[in-house]
């Protein structure tokens, strides 16, 4: 009987010992690969200086989307400029916005667009990653003008604070380390 228990414990310990535990570096590497693949798949151009302000979408001469990579690691693409005469969002402003959150494979995670929500989302900008809408998401809002639209790729390191997925079937652990693609429209700034 004792030999049987020893064998069971030995098999169990070998099973647990063979379980892979992902490190933070593993998540960073996986994210970098996913982001690189996403931009390659959509044939986007990445720049490190903010493009000159234009009224429409940031596109290069070959009609490829231009994404501005900020120092924080946010990838920001202007879809439309919006009202340049209106107040610009900044830390301590209250903003109203609509957004769609997706993974980099275009799987919807959450939507606060008109068809899903009667009112825009209201947020007091803190600039902090402690908020549900992390630092990268808030940074995206601060680049927008009232009525403007953008696409933003936000690293898990500067953004994703979702605890659960309303759509897409992700677990909270999956979401914690998932780079997100946001379509954002700024409705108003107070």
Which residues are covered by each model-predicted region?
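Sec-dependent bacterial lipoprotein signal peptides
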Residues: 1-19
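Cross-family detector of peptidyl-prolyl cis-trans isomerase
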Residues: 19-190
């Amino acid at each position: 009987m004792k030999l049987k228990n020893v064998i069971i414990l030995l098999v169990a310990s070998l099973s647990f010992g063979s379980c892979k535990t992902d490190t933070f570096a593993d998540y960073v590497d996986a994210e970098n690969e996913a982001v690189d693949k996403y931009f390659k798949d959509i044939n986007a151009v990445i720049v490190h200086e903010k493009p000159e302000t234009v009224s429409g979408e940031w596109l290069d001469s070959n009609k490829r989307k231009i994404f501005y990579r900020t120092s924080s690691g946010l990838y920001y693409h202007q879809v439309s400029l919006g009202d340049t005469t209106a107040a610009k969002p900044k830390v301590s402003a209250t903003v109203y916005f609509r957004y769609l959150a997706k993974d980099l494979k275009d799987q919807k995670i959450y939507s606060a667009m008109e068809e899903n929500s009667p009112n825009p989302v209201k947020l007091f900008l803190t600039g902090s990653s402690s908020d549900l809408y992390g630092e990268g998401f808030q940074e995206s809002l601060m680049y927008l003008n009232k009525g403007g639209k953008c696409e933003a790729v936000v690293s898990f390191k500067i953004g994703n604070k979702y605890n659960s997925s309303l759509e897409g079937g992700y677990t909270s652990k999956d979401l914690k380390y998932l780079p997100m693609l946001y379509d954002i429209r700024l409705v108003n700034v107070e």
